Amino acid sequence: MAKRALGLGKSKKQKKQKVAVPEEQSSEGTVPAPSAANQIEIALDENEDADDELVQLKGLWETFLKDKDNQLLLNGVVHECDRLLRLQDNDSTIKLSDLFHSIYAQALAELTVFLPEETDDEEKKYERMNEFFDAALERYRLGAEKYPETPLLSLTQTKIILQRIPLQYISQLSPLDQNDEKYKLYDLLESAKSSYTLSSNQHQLAYDVLLSFYDLLDIIETFEDKEELEDGLDSDDEGEELVEVVLHENHPLTKIKKNMNQNYEWLKENLLNLFNDISSSFCNKVGPDIDKDHPTVVLFKSIARTLGQLYLKLAEEPSKTFAELMYDSDDEEQTDKEALEKAKNAQSKAIPLVEYAIRYLQEAKVEDEPQTWVDVAEAIIDLGNLYDYESKEQEDSYKRAEEILLKANKATHGKYQVILDNLLNKD
């Protein structure tokens, strides 16, 4: 891979440092060593010691996080960690912090992402993946022995487990499996949730962990979809419906799927805690003229957007129930007292969820990013759809959404015309 200089120097309070990737083989023999000729330019904060090797490692790791497809950078992180361990072996005065152990553990876990590119042998790939994840968790454990109270290492453990479940285990599963005792994925997921800890100086890592959890829930929730699609494609009857796949009681994912509501509730609660922590510790202490590209501002808006999307996700089921009973059923069912009561219950559940979604999507708005305005408008349309037909609340919602879409459409020279037309053509 060709070398490239990677600078993070958007801030005037940063200075650049070139770090040579070491030539030696990894002490564990895990990674092919890059050439010493490769030098990577990293950016350090102005108040950090550019000669401090742990500072350089942190800068190298943060550079990789901005370019996670760059295996050269990742190999450089692992080799630098190995080198620092060897230095410590020869000099007992060298202290390796909890941050060192966290970076090393995360880097070992990240190496698994590149394994599909290295071999097509599934058995060998699984063995290598198992080695890397075991090494990552062992590095976490060694760090936790030295720093037992650090939230950073607890978050690191959660992150590694949430990577391992889909990459190593779910990738091996089929809908026909009945080997829950082999993987014990429910217990593994619960252990990841238990080790999650929010720390005021680890907001970005906490958000990354919660995003991984969100992605994992989506993978588990849609696990059967691929099998259903493949069965449908194999069918000779074009009119034949897809056959629903039902997992066996002893399938490794069954217990997790039965507890999806609790998992989404856990995700929502921890995203809210993270959002509120940043709001109180940062946003309430800065002025309105804060740079929109400030890392904490970007993170805050990303969390708000994720919360908005999550609330819309949680509103999907009651919204669907309401729409089916009120608009997709026959006239007799629409006047049935029991069906109407069920529709009203679904409506009362969905409306507050969509209102929360709108609130957080508004927090996520960026003045010069029209898509963030449209996200709000589409949520307002969803809210309008939940109000009684042709009610004042419904008409007001559609009007609000129309005003936002007109502004966004004008700013983007017609990019959102289809959405706008669909709104204006509502019966």
UniProtKB/Swiss-Prot annotation:
GO biological process, any: regulation of translation
Does this entry carry the keyword Nucleus?
Answer: yes
GO cellular component: a single term? nucleus
Give the UniProt keywords, A-Z.
Nucleus, Transcription, Transcription regulation, Translation regulation
Q: Quick check: keyword Transcription in the entry?
A: yes
- Pfam families for this protein: Nro1
Where's it found, cell-wise?
Nucleus
Q: Which InterPro entries match?
A: Nro1/ETT1 (IPR024318)
Q: Where are the stretches annotated Disordered? A: 1-37
**Functional summary from the UniProt entry:** Required for correct translation termination and probably involved in regulation of hypoxic gene expression.
Q: Which family does it belong to?
A: Belongs to the ETT1 family.
- Name the record gives this protein: Enhancer of translation termination 1
Task: Give the classification, highest ranks.
Answer: Eukaryota, Fungi, Dikarya, Ascomycota, Saccharomycotina
- Its gene is ETT1
